[in-house]
Amino acid sequence: MARGCDTLFAESVLAVQRRCPELRLVAMIPCPSQPDAWPEADRARYSRLLAACSEIRVLEPSYSDGCMLRRNRAMADAAALLVTVYDGGPGGTAATIRYARQKGKQILPLWY
């Protein structure tokens, strides 16, 4: 989970989960140190979300080059549908959308 849309989607899942308890929130964490440089308020929000997850998958024991990309690919591999918020610029979201398309994943763009 990252700041921004990932956090908003996670909070939305938890809100819907109150009415639909079979819904699960699974966090894909690239490495345990992911939030270390974030502002305190964001780290606290992240901790609350992790505590509410049905499952937490930590992909690597420590930060390394490419760990965010590998996390994004793991999320795409695990997803039946990718819901994307994307501004058209280069970066991790663009790479993940390209990867998902190559894998034949269904993509629902909310903003493109």
Residue positions per predicted region:
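Acidic/glycine-enriched connector segments
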Residues: 1-112
